[in-house]
């Protein structure tokens, strides 16, 4: 087709092995990637090129890609008012349609709360911040409590769990915490609500001999709250059918990303392709294992779905931050391990079980003094855990789609361990959609 001089000359980046014109760079701008440019620094003993990354070429390509993005904004400014208004309306309805509410829980009376019992544990009253947080959780059916250490997250969990049960917002809530803290959580709940039916899991309950009986106990009884440690929670089997659906959805996203990269041909790095192919292989292995579990399952296994838990409070929720995610980016620093941990994946299975039961997002409350510690990936993963339906409404199915809207990559140059200057990409800037 017809190509203007602007495409073929002005936006041309000359590499050692090949050139990249404006059309190539436009594709990279749309996919939020950059050409993987190499150059030769000599020959090896067999006469083959010794290849290294062409940092100068990549830097120039990044500059041209930024120019294309800025040019798109300039092009938009030149369009008719009607076109801009229509585009703005479409964007705002999809991404910029939320206003952060202010929650005032001062009107709550907490009729079953035993303040005398709490006083024996050194708790004199419920802080306004705790009331506001409980009101937020009751209104939304869960959320994030990012209060600092010492601001009373334990009491928030206990009151919110009991209030949800009292108001039929949840029928069987669960609280999980660190092994060192979970006894304190159970004692606080018992002091706050001495008449509540609480099931607190001991180490003996989770012994191999007693575990099946304990799981059936959760399933067959109407407890006000079930309390256990993170480690104990990890021993609860998850529904294999639900695992199969989630892993298949992850695999579908990986295959979509692979197809996008293959369409770009040699414009993308082998490492990027290799990373996604490895992830695909790992997911296929997990799916095979789950399918085997479905075929060989016995009737006496009680899984999380059968227990009837319909809300889970996760104290120190940052312990589950290493959730699996899909990305095409292989050279962006600070993204973490996209494979994630089995511990976090197990939590995703549990939260999805609750969300499928209730037919809506949330169904869980994350409590931590360090909700986000060191990367934007953790922010995306909070949405993945808690707001899957909203992400689907926004057509966000992977980290790359989310970061293209809400984040921006920055490129810096720094010295590596061999004192050479290397390019480092980071997902640093959070861009508000407003």
Where are these regions (language model features)?
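Conserved SF1/SF2 helicase motif Ia
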Residues: 160-185, 358-361
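Charged, low-complexity intrinsically disordered regions
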Residues: 1-95, 194, 218-226, 242-264, ...
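Conserved P-loop NTPase motor "coupling/switch" region that bridges the ATPase
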Residues: 191, 195-204, 248-277, 311, ...
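Conserved helicase motor
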Residues: 201-209, 231
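Pre-Walker A (Motif I) flank of P-loop NTPase domains
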Residues: 140-143, 171, 362-363
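Walker A/P-loop
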Residues: 141-160
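Conserved pre-motif I regulatory segment
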Residues: 105-143
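Conserved RecA-like ASCE ATPase "motif II neighborhood" in helicase/translocase motors
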Residues: 229-257, 272, 279-307, 342-350
């Amino acid at each position: 087709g017809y190509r203007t001089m602007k495409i073929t000359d002005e936006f041309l980046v000359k590499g050692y092995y090949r050139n990249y014109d404006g059309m190539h760079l436009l594709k990279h701008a749309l996919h939020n990637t950059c050409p993987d440019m190499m150059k030769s620094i000599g020959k090896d003993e067999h006469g083959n090129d010794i290849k290294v990354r062409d940092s100068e070429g990549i830097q120039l390509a990044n500059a041209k890609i930024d120019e294309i993005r800025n040019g798109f904004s300039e092009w938009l400014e030149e369009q008719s008012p009607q076109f801009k208004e229509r585009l703005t309306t479409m964007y705002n309805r999809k991404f910029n349609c939320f206003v952060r509410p202010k929650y005032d829980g001062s009107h709550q009376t907490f009729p079953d709360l035993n303040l005398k019992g709490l006083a024996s544990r050194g708790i004199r009253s419920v802080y306004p911040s705790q009331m506001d947080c409980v009101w937020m959780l009751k209104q939304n059916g869960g959320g994030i409590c990012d209060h600092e250490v010492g601001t009373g997250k334990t009491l928030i969990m206990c009151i919110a769990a009991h209030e949800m049960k009292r108001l039929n917002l949840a029928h069987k809530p669960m609280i999980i915490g660190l092994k060192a803290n979970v006894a304190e959580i159970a004692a606080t709940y018992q002091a706050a609500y001495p008449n509540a039916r609480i099931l607190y899991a001991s180490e003996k309950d989770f012994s191999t001999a007693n575990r099946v009986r304990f799981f059936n106990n959760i399933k067959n009884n109407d407890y006000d709250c079930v309390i256990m440690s993170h480690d104990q929670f990890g021993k609860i089997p998850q529904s294999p059918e639900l695992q199969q659906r989630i892993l298949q959805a992850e695999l579908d996203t990986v295959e979509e990303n692979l197809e996008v990269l293959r369409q770009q041909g040699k414009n993308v790095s082998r490492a990027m392709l290799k990373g996604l192919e490895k992830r695909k292989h790992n997911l296929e292995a997990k799916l095979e294992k789950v399918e085997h579990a479905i075929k060989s399952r016995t009737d006496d296994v009680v899984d999380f779905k059968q227990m009837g838990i319909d809300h889970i409070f996760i104290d120190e929720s940052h312990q589950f931050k290493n959730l699996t995610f899909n990305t095409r980016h292989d050279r962006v620093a600070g993204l973490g391990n996209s494979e994630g941990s089995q511990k976090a994946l197990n939590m995703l299975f549990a939260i999805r079980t609750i969300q499928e039961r209730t037919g809506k997002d949330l169904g869980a409350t994350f409590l931590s003094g360090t909700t986000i510690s060191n990367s934007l990936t953790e922010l995306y993963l909070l949405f993945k855990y808690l707001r899957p339906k909203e992400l689907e409404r926004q057509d966000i199915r992977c980290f790359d789609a989310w970061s293209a809207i809400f984040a921006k990559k920055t490129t810096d140059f720094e010295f590596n361990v061999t004192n050479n200057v290397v390019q480092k990409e980071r997902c640093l800037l959070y861009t508000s959609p407003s």
